[in-house]
Amino acid sequence: MKRYICSIIICLVVLLSIGTYYVKVASSASGLPTYTIKTIEGSDKELDSVRVHAALEVGNFYEPLMIDSNRNTNIRGRSFWSDEFDYRIERLVSEHRSFMRGKDVIDSFYEDADFLAYASLNNEYTKSGKMNAEFDVALLDKKDEDETSFRIAVPDQGRFMNTEVWDVQLIHSKLQVLTMNDVDSNDDKQTKEVHLYTIDLAKKEVVSDRTLVSETFTYPDQVEFNIPVDISPSQPNNMILFSIIKGVTHEEGDYEEKPKDSKLLSYQYDTEKLTTIKGAKKESLNLDIARSGYTDGKNLYAIDGTSGKYHLKTFDLSSEALTNDMELDLAFNKRDENFVAIKNGRVYFLVGNRREKETLTNDPAQLLIADLKTGKTLYKGETVRHAADKKNDQKIGFYISNLEVK
């Protein structure tokens, strides 16, 4: 009987804690400022596809804030278990609700006119401490809405302590799944690998496991694998870029990169060719540009502010050459953080999160929309803060987390 009483008490404490959290959130939300976007130049219609994700910092609480296309503000208390869906996931859910159940990571999808494919990794650890990893695979034939789904074990799963899906492509009825794997080790050595798994959808099995890159290092040396931001992660792509960043952690705890030891690589799915991009020519694609770039599988777009002005540079991935360099009509400030989206033949450029001596200011965020080819400004605007409680307004921080475009 005592055991049941203890269980009941624990449940009541948990429910009371959750209830207290939501009461605090609800009471604080009523006094929070709201935000809209004020048009400075151009047509308001350019905002129809824009959504700005942000947060308000109120003491120890963070309130999600969404400034959507009609310039209204949506503030809501965040659930302990909620997921923030973006436009791309929302569209897939609305079009294929049954297939999308339980699937919410855009990097795990592939979509063309005929098929919607999905491949994710489920990682669990056994009692012995080894990882038990499975591919969760699904394919939807859009024509007849026929769904196929299955799970298969990751080859040599006992070697790995962590796996992450980078890219999914459907080529000749086989899924190509590119992953970054951390190898388990019993000594001081650490190993990171990039794997390409080929999954035969008809046989429901992994028919190939190719290690594209393997790097072994020992502390204080460090190695990181990175990929540029993919602005269209679910679309068919024949090429993917990734970088190997090497560095060292000094005794004082400071980290120093080793640019000469780091490199940029490209992998071509159709030719199965792995190439090191050297960037030897002036104004050609290189490691520094790719690390801060945005790619759509054909081009890489990078923001450059070294001249004291914002420039959007476009590089052709196949030739590695600079094909366009346009100046953006927005004042440059090195204390600003920038967010970029490339879509609809436009560049959407948002700057904000300005800091003064490491303190976040409440300065307005600036939004620019320009034609991707000509650089012509189509829209300029800025966020406007509407205080609900002027007495406490300056104590509330505003932080931008993402820029989304339909």
Predicted features and spans:
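Hydrophilic extracytoplasmic domains
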Residues: 17-49, 281-406
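Surface-exposed loop and turn segments in beta-propeller and other repeat-based domains
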Residues: 72-100, 149-160, 208-227, 275-286, ...
